[in-house]
């Protein structure tokens, strides 16, 4: 830190130069985050000084968090769900598994059973909590093999998980089947819908994946993905709100005396932004956003197949994967662990972006 500060213009110039080094969204085809909605950006500024970690100081912002949780609970077919705004899917998954562990204190060597598609946050969770992670291989279409999942459950298992909108392929595990496994074995069942939670409800005839399925204990979903909020904003929802009490710690010097959240200081700005977008768009607006992304996904697949790129799987949502092949320079495309090209067609990936990409693909084929 320098002894004397700089002029405002110098600071802005410096930061602008760094920002210019960041990649432009019109060439990013691999991210599950997107450009925030302009409403979210505006509202974020309104609430930039708020801290949900001390709710007595910010009762209005706390009410917004409550409304966000209620709105997302309604979307997940359970308006009475308990929940709070997290920093994203990693925190949500960790907290869900913490609860699962707290609910089974008698198990001394606990394990969790997760699909091969599980996000790496489950690895972090098991490392932090000292759990064994049992990974179930894929069945058909890069979804979990439910028969093998049932076989891997034993007396030390505390939870099973499903992924609704897998990170690599955008697929949905058979939540109803896994729920039966959970109920038969008295297990906590967590659905990681960090990506799919704000996509699947807006698809035509969506597969059951949320609290309408008996046996689902918790759901994670991220408004900072397809919800187009500012980053970071996730949400953890519980079927039984009182289970959050297993995580409570005393907070004697705050305006509340107990706290179940992982972070202490929690920004209210992203939460307000997320709620603002939900209020602005409504279900009708989100259906239109998702429909647009799906239409662009189909156009991408059509174009890639015309150049000889074979799709890896028929997508359920706005993720497209293909057998490996050349990618034009300047475009950010990722690869799955199996080596497939992976595209995520977020709201910033417009039809013009798709056509520009396909035009560049044509030049190298």
UniProtKB/Swiss-Prot annotation:
Which EC number(s) are documented for this chain? Answer: 4.1.1.11, 4.1.1.25
Keyword Lyase (UniProt): yes
Question: What are its cofactors?
Answer: pyridoxal 5'-phosphate
Q: Which reaction does it catalyse?
A: L-tyrosine + H(+) = tyramine + CO2; L-aspartate + H(+) = beta-alanine + CO2
InterPro entries the record matches: GrpII_AminoAcid_Decarb (IPR050477), MfnA (IPR020931), PyrdxlP-dep_de-COase (IPR002129), PyrdxlP-dep_Trfase (IPR015424), PyrdxlP-dep_Trfase_major (IPR015421), PyrdxlP-dep_Trfase_small (IPR015422), Pyridoxal-P_BS (IPR021115)
Q: Which Gene3D superfamilies match?
A: Aspartate Aminotransferase, domain 1, Type I PLP-dependent aspartate aminotransferase-like (Major domain)
The record ties this protein, via SUPFAM superfamilies, to: PLP-dependent transferases
PROSITE patterns reported for this sequence: DDC_GAD_HDC_YDC
Per the UniProt entry, the signal peptide is none
Pfam families, sorted: Pyridoxal_deC (PF00282)
Residues bearing the modification N6-(pyridoxal phosphate)lysine: 225
| Keyword terms | Decarboxylase, Lyase, Pyridoxal phosphate
Pathway field of the UniProt record reads: Cofactor biosynthesis; methanofuran biosynthesis; Cofactor biosynthesis; coenzyme A biosynthesis
PANTHER family under this entry? Answer: PTHR42735, SPHINGOSINE-1-PHOSPHATE LYASE 1 (PTHR42735:SF6)
- Main role? Catalyzes the decarboxylation of L-tyrosine to produce tyramine for methanofuran biosynthesis. Can also catalyze the decarboxylation of L-aspartate to produce beta-alanine for coenzyme A (CoA) biosynthesis.
HAMAP family for this protein: MfnA_decarbox
Q: What is the protein name stated in its UniProt record?
A: Probable L-tyrosine/L-aspartate decarboxylase
